[in-house]
Design a protein with these regions (language model features):
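Hydrophobic core of alpha-helical transmembrane segments in multi-pass integral membrane proteins
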Residues: 3-11, 53-65, 88-94, 124-127, ...
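Interfacial transmembrane-helix boundary/kink motif in multi-pass membrane proteins
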Residues: 29-56, 103-133, 282-292, 315-317
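Membrane-helix interface linkers and caps
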Residues: 76-122, 140-143, 298-316
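Juxtamembrane helix-loop-helix connectors linking adjacent transmembrane helices
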Residues: 73-80, 104-178, 193
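C-terminal membrane module of polytopic membrane proteins
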Residues: 246-317
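Membrane-interface helix/loop boundary segments of multi-pass membrane proteins
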Residues: 178-203, 230-237
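Hydrophobic alpha-helical transmembrane segments
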Residues: 1-3, 156-176, 276-296
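Junction motif at the cytosolic side of a transmembrane helix
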Residues: 5-46, 300-317
Protein backbone atom coordinates (compact mmCIF):
# COMPACT_ATOMS: atom_id res chain seq x y z
CA UNK A 1 0.00 0.00 0.00
CA UNK A 2 2.84 2.37 0.87
CA UNK A 3 4.53 1.69 -2.48
CA UNK A 4 1.28 2.31 -4.35
CA UNK A 5 0.73 5.59 -2.51
CA UNK A 6 4.26 6.73 -3.37
CA UNK A 7 3.84 5.83 -7.04
CA UNK A 8 0.51 7.63 -7.27
CA UNK A 9 1.90 10.69 -5.49
CA UNK A 10 4.93 10.81 -7.81
CA UNK A 11 2.73 10.48 -10.87
CA UNK A 12 0.49 13.27 -9.65
CA UNK A 13 3.49 15.51 -8.96
CA UNK A 14 4.90 14.88 -12.44
CA UNK A 15 1.57 15.82 -13.99
CA UNK A 16 1.63 19.09 -12.08
CA UNK A 17 5.25 19.92 -12.97
CA UNK A 18 4.50 19.31 -16.64
CA UNK A 19 2.29 22.39 -16.60
CA UNK A 20 4.69 25.34 -16.52
CA UNK A 21 1.86 27.86 -16.27
CA UNK A 22 0.75 26.21 -13.07
CA UNK A 23 3.99 25.60 -11.25
CA UNK A 24 6.12 28.58 -12.19
CA UNK A 25 5.72 32.31 -12.28
CA UNK A 26 8.07 34.93 -13.64
CA UNK A 27 10.85 34.10 -11.19
CA UNK A 28 10.73 30.42 -12.08
CA UNK A 29 9.80 29.37 -8.56
CA UNK A 30 6.85 27.29 -7.53
CA UNK A 31 4.07 29.38 -6.00
CA UNK A 32 1.39 27.78 -3.80
CA UNK A 33 -1.06 30.64 -4.27
CA UNK A 34 -0.69 30.51 -8.05
CA UNK A 35 -1.14 26.74 -8.06
CA UNK A 36 -4.32 26.92 -5.97
CA UNK A 37 -5.60 29.70 -8.21
CA UNK A 38 -5.01 27.46 -11.22
CA UNK A 39 -6.94 24.58 -9.67
CA UNK A 40 -9.88 26.88 -8.95
CA UNK A 41 -9.78 28.67 -12.31
CA UNK A 42 -9.51 25.54 -14.45
CA UNK A 43 -12.15 23.48 -12.67
CA UNK A 44 -14.00 20.98 -14.85
CA UNK A 45 -17.37 19.29 -14.45
CA UNK A 46 -15.63 16.22 -13.01
CA UNK A 47 -12.26 15.84 -11.33
CA UNK A 48 -9.00 15.65 -13.23
CA UNK A 49 -7.44 12.14 -13.19
CA UNK A 50 -4.55 13.42 -11.05
CA UNK A 51 -6.97 14.93 -8.52
CA UNK A 52 -8.92 11.66 -8.38
CA UNK A 53 -5.70 9.78 -7.65
CA UNK A 54 -4.77 12.31 -4.99
CA UNK A 55 -8.14 11.76 -3.32
CA UNK A 56 -7.53 8.02 -3.21
CA UNK A 57 -4.08 8.54 -1.70
CA UNK A 58 -5.48 10.87 0.97
CA UNK A 59 -8.06 8.26 1.94
CA UNK A 60 -5.42 5.53 2.27
CA UNK A 61 -3.04 7.74 4.23
CA UNK A 62 -5.86 8.89 6.49
CA UNK A 63 -6.95 5.30 7.16
CA UNK A 64 -3.36 4.34 7.97
CA UNK A 65 -2.68 7.10 10.50
CA UNK A 66 -6.15 6.98 12.04
CA UNK A 67 -5.39 3.65 13.70
CA UNK A 68 -2.77 5.35 15.87
CA UNK A 69 -5.17 7.99 17.18
CA UNK A 70 -8.32 5.96 17.82
CA UNK A 71 -8.82 5.24 21.50
CA UNK A 72 -9.24 1.55 22.40
CA UNK A 73 -12.22 2.59 24.51
CA UNK A 74 -14.02 4.16 21.55
CA UNK A 75 -17.22 2.36 20.57
CA UNK A 76 -17.43 0.65 17.20
CA UNK A 77 -20.34 2.99 16.37
CA UNK A 78 -18.15 6.07 16.83
CA UNK A 79 -15.19 4.55 15.00
CA UNK A 80 -17.33 3.40 12.07
CA UNK A 81 -18.92 6.82 11.60
CA UNK A 82 -15.58 8.64 11.89
CA UNK A 83 -13.92 6.35 9.35
CA UNK A 84 -16.74 6.27 6.83
CA UNK A 85 -17.83 9.90 7.01
CA UNK A 86 -14.65 11.64 8.14
CA UNK A 87 -11.94 9.71 6.29
CA UNK A 88 -13.71 8.35 3.20
CA UNK A 89 -16.70 10.54 2.34
CA UNK A 90 -15.46 13.96 3.52
CA UNK A 91 -12.31 14.18 1.32
CA UNK A 92 -14.13 13.39 -1.91
CA UNK A 93 -17.08 15.69 -1.10
CA UNK A 94 -14.77 18.60 -0.21
CA UNK A 95 -12.66 18.08 -3.33
CA UNK A 96 -15.81 17.85 -5.45
CA UNK A 97 -17.05 21.14 -4.00
CA UNK A 98 -13.73 22.97 -4.32
CA UNK A 99 -12.12 21.48 -7.42
CA UNK A 100 -15.05 20.82 -9.79
CA UNK A 101 -17.83 22.93 -11.24
CA UNK A 102 -20.58 20.41 -10.49
CA UNK A 103 -20.23 18.42 -7.25
CA UNK A 104 -23.27 16.33 -8.16
CA UNK A 105 -21.78 15.25 -11.48
CA UNK A 106 -18.32 14.87 -9.95
CA UNK A 107 -19.79 12.39 -7.46
CA UNK A 108 -21.66 10.71 -10.37
CA UNK A 109 -25.11 11.22 -8.86
CA UNK A 110 -27.24 10.80 -11.97
CA UNK A 111 -30.74 9.62 -12.73
CA UNK A 112 -30.70 5.84 -13.24
CA UNK A 113 -32.68 3.63 -15.60
CA UNK A 114 -35.41 1.59 -13.95
CA UNK A 115 -34.13 -1.57 -15.66
CA UNK A 116 -30.68 -0.96 -14.20
CA UNK A 117 -32.07 -0.44 -10.70
CA UNK A 118 -34.06 -3.67 -10.95
CA UNK A 119 -31.03 -5.56 -12.23
CA UNK A 120 -28.86 -4.12 -9.44
CA UNK A 121 -31.25 -5.35 -6.74
CA UNK A 122 -31.31 -8.84 -8.25
CA UNK A 123 -27.53 -8.86 -8.76
CA UNK A 124 -27.04 -7.99 -5.11
CA UNK A 125 -28.86 -11.16 -4.07
CA UNK A 126 -27.65 -13.39 -6.91
CA UNK A 127 -23.98 -12.45 -6.56
CA UNK A 128 -23.67 -12.96 -2.81
CA UNK A 129 -23.29 -16.79 -2.86
CA UNK A 130 -20.39 -16.46 -5.29
CA UNK A 131 -18.84 -13.74 -3.13
CA UNK A 132 -19.08 -16.02 -0.10
CA UNK A 133 -17.35 -18.83 -2.02
CA UNK A 134 -14.63 -16.40 -3.09
CA UNK A 135 -14.03 -15.38 0.52
CA UNK A 136 -13.67 -18.99 1.65
CA UNK A 137 -11.30 -19.77 -1.24
CA UNK A 138 -9.08 -16.81 -0.36
CA UNK A 139 -8.93 -17.87 3.30
CA UNK A 140 -7.99 -21.42 2.27
CA UNK A 141 -5.10 -20.08 0.18
CA UNK A 142 -4.05 -17.35 2.61
CA UNK A 143 -5.08 -18.51 6.11
CA UNK A 144 -5.83 -15.82 8.67
CA UNK A 145 -3.16 -15.54 11.38
CA UNK A 146 -3.97 -16.39 14.98
CA UNK A 147 -3.60 -12.80 16.21
CA UNK A 148 -5.79 -11.46 13.42
CA UNK A 149 -8.35 -14.19 14.04
CA UNK A 150 -8.47 -13.30 17.74
CA UNK A 151 -8.98 -9.63 16.91
CA UNK A 152 -11.76 -10.54 14.47
CA UNK A 153 -13.48 -12.71 17.04
CA UNK A 154 -13.35 -9.91 19.61
CA UNK A 155 -14.76 -7.47 17.07
CA UNK A 156 -17.52 -9.85 16.03
CA UNK A 157 -18.41 -10.50 19.65
CA UNK A 158 -18.77 -6.76 20.20
CA UNK A 159 -20.69 -6.09 17.00
CA UNK A 160 -23.13 -8.99 17.07
CA UNK A 161 -24.30 -8.02 20.54
CA UNK A 162 -26.08 -5.11 18.86
CA UNK A 163 -29.53 -5.21 17.32
CA UNK A 164 -29.52 -6.36 13.71
CA UNK A 165 -30.95 -3.08 12.39
CA UNK A 166 -28.10 -1.14 14.02
CA UNK A 167 -25.52 -3.42 12.43
CA UNK A 168 -27.15 -3.15 9.00
CA UNK A 169 -27.30 0.62 9.25
CA UNK A 170 -23.69 1.09 10.35
CA UNK A 171 -21.90 -1.73 8.51
CA UNK A 172 -24.05 -2.17 5.39
CA UNK A 173 -25.89 1.03 4.45
CA UNK A 174 -23.36 3.62 5.65
CA UNK A 175 -20.27 2.01 4.04
CA UNK A 176 -22.19 1.41 0.82
CA UNK A 177 -23.08 5.10 0.53
CA UNK A 178 -19.76 6.57 1.65
CA UNK A 179 -17.45 4.15 -0.16
CA UNK A 180 -19.39 4.18 -3.41
CA UNK A 181 -19.57 7.99 -3.55
CA UNK A 182 -15.80 8.01 -3.01
CA UNK A 183 -14.51 5.11 -5.12
CA UNK A 184 -17.18 4.67 -7.81
CA UNK A 185 -18.17 8.32 -7.63
CA UNK A 186 -15.50 10.99 -7.37
CA UNK A 187 -12.43 8.83 -7.97
CA UNK A 188 -14.00 6.70 -10.71
CA UNK A 189 -15.40 9.76 -12.49
CA UNK A 190 -12.01 11.48 -12.55
CA UNK A 191 -10.18 8.39 -13.78
CA UNK A 192 -12.86 7.79 -16.42
CA UNK A 193 -11.93 10.96 -18.28
CA UNK A 194 -9.98 10.77 -21.53
CA UNK A 195 -11.45 7.33 -22.38
CA UNK A 196 -9.94 5.82 -19.23
CA UNK A 197 -12.52 3.07 -18.66
CA UNK A 198 -10.01 0.32 -17.86
CA UNK A 199 -7.98 2.68 -15.69
CA UNK A 200 -11.06 3.76 -13.75
CA UNK A 201 -12.29 0.21 -13.12
CA UNK A 202 -8.94 -1.25 -12.05
CA UNK A 203 -7.48 1.64 -10.03
CA UNK A 204 -10.71 2.36 -8.16
CA UNK A 205 -11.03 -1.36 -7.34
CA UNK A 206 -7.48 -1.53 -5.99
CA UNK A 207 -7.91 1.61 -3.89
CA UNK A 208 -11.18 0.21 -2.58
CA UNK A 209 -9.49 -3.05 -1.67
CA UNK A 210 -6.57 -1.35 0.07
CA UNK A 211 -8.91 0.46 2.46
CA UNK A 212 -9.65 -2.92 4.07
CA UNK A 213 -7.01 -3.61 6.70
CA UNK A 214 -7.04 -7.43 6.56
CA UNK A 215 -5.33 -9.06 3.55
CA UNK A 216 -8.11 -11.57 2.89
CA UNK A 217 -10.75 -8.84 2.98
CA UNK A 218 -8.60 -6.63 0.78
CA UNK A 219 -8.37 -9.28 -1.94
CA UNK A 220 -12.07 -10.09 -1.96
CA UNK A 221 -12.96 -6.38 -1.83
CA UNK A 222 -10.71 -5.70 -4.84
CA UNK A 223 -12.49 -8.40 -6.84
CA UNK A 224 -15.86 -7.00 -5.82
CA UNK A 225 -14.54 -3.56 -6.73
CA UNK A 226 -13.92 -4.71 -10.30
CA UNK A 227 -17.55 -5.82 -10.61
CA UNK A 228 -18.82 -2.64 -9.00
CA UNK A 229 -16.64 -0.63 -11.38
CA UNK A 230 -18.19 -2.40 -14.34
CA UNK A 231 -21.66 -1.64 -12.97
CA UNK A 232 -20.69 1.99 -12.36
CA UNK A 233 -19.51 2.37 -15.94
CA UNK A 234 -22.50 0.69 -17.56
CA UNK A 235 -25.13 2.47 -15.45
CA UNK A 236 -23.52 5.91 -15.57
CA UNK A 237 -23.65 6.58 -11.84
CA UNK A 238 -23.31 5.30 -8.28
CA UNK A 239 -26.91 4.50 -7.43
CA UNK A 240 -26.79 0.90 -8.66
CA UNK A 241 -23.40 0.23 -7.08
CA UNK A 242 -24.72 1.50 -3.74
CA UNK A 243 -27.60 -0.98 -4.03
CA UNK A 244 -25.35 -3.96 -4.85
CA UNK A 245 -22.81 -3.00 -2.17
CA UNK A 246 -25.48 -2.54 0.50
CA UNK A 247 -27.25 -5.82 -0.28
CA UNK A 248 -23.97 -7.76 -0.35
CA UNK A 249 -22.87 -6.37 3.01
CA UNK A 250 -26.35 -6.77 4.45
CA UNK A 251 -26.62 -10.44 3.53
CA UNK A 252 -23.19 -11.24 4.97
CA UNK A 253 -23.99 -9.46 8.22
CA UNK A 254 -27.48 -10.94 8.53
CA UNK A 255 -26.28 -14.51 8.02
CA UNK A 256 -23.40 -14.04 10.47
CA UNK A 257 -25.66 -12.36 13.06
CA UNK A 258 -28.24 -15.13 12.86
CA UNK A 259 -25.56 -17.81 13.20
CA UNK A 260 -23.90 -16.07 16.16
CA UNK A 261 -27.25 -15.80 17.90
CA UNK A 262 -27.99 -19.51 17.23
CA UNK A 263 -31.02 -18.85 15.07
CA UNK A 264 -32.30 -21.65 12.84
CA UNK A 265 -32.64 -21.20 9.10
CA UNK A 266 -36.29 -20.37 8.29
CA UNK A 267 -38.17 -23.09 6.44
CA UNK A 268 -38.76 -20.71 3.55
CA UNK A 269 -34.99 -20.46 2.97
CA UNK A 270 -34.00 -24.11 3.43
CA UNK A 271 -33.88 -24.59 -0.32
CA UNK A 272 -30.95 -22.12 -0.59
CA UNK A 273 -29.31 -21.85 2.85
CA UNK A 274 -28.04 -24.44 5.30
CA UNK A 275 -26.66 -24.16 8.83
CA UNK A 276 -23.36 -25.83 9.74
CA UNK A 277 -20.41 -25.63 12.10
CA UNK A 278 -19.10 -22.50 10.37
CA UNK A 279 -22.49 -20.80 10.42
CA UNK A 280 -25.01 -20.17 7.68
CA UNK A 281 -23.93 -20.90 4.11
CA UNK A 282 -25.49 -21.41 0.71
CA UNK A 283 -26.21 -24.86 -0.66
CA UNK A 284 -23.86 -25.93 -3.51
CA UNK A 285 -26.63 -26.03 -6.11
CA UNK A 286 -27.64 -22.44 -5.34
CA UNK A 287 -24.03 -21.32 -5.61
CA UNK A 288 -23.95 -22.58 -9.20
CA UNK A 289 -27.33 -21.05 -10.02
CA UNK A 290 -26.19 -17.70 -8.64
CA UNK A 291 -23.31 -17.54 -11.12
CA UNK A 292 -25.64 -18.14 -14.07
CA UNK A 293 -28.15 -15.58 -12.78
CA UNK A 294 -25.45 -12.99 -12.16
CA UNK A 295 -24.13 -13.30 -15.73
CA UNK A 296 -27.64 -12.98 -17.15
CA UNK A 297 -28.39 -9.94 -15.00
CA UNK A 298 -25.12 -8.26 -15.95
CA UNK A 299 -26.21 -8.47 -19.59
CA UNK A 300 -29.15 -6.23 -18.72
CA UNK A 301 -26.70 -3.53 -17.64
CA UNK A 302 -25.28 -3.44 -21.15
CA UNK A 303 -28.60 -2.13 -22.44
CA UNK A 304 -28.30 1.62 -22.04
CA UNK A 305 -30.92 4.23 -22.73
CA UNK A 306 -29.95 7.25 -24.83
CA UNK A 307 -29.83 9.44 -21.75
CA UNK A 308 -27.48 7.06 -19.92
CA UNK A 309 -25.33 6.76 -23.03
CA UNK A 310 -25.01 10.55 -23.25
CA UNK A 311 -24.03 10.77 -19.57
CA UNK A 312 -21.30 8.13 -19.89
CA UNK A 313 -19.90 9.56 -23.13
CA UNK A 314 -19.72 13.02 -21.54
CA UNK A 315 -17.81 11.60 -18.57
CA UNK A 316 -15.31 9.86 -20.84
CA UNK A 317 -14.54 13.00 -22.85
Amino acid sequence: VTLLCCLLAIRWAIRQFESETVMFHEGGKWDMQLWLHHLWRDRQVTAQPSVALLCGVLILVGRFFAQFFVSPQASFVTVTILVQVGLILAPCVLMAMLLTRSPRKALRIHRTQLSHVTAAVLIGFALHPSYQVLGKAIVSIYPIGSETMLALQNFEGLVFQQELWVILLLLAALPAICEELAFRGFIFGGLLRQQGVLRAVIVSALLFGFTHAILQQSISASVMGLLLGLIAWRTGGVFCTIIVHCINNGLSLTMAWCAKNSLAVPDALNWAIESGVEGWSYRPEWQFISIVLSIALFLILFQRSRQTERVVLAEMA
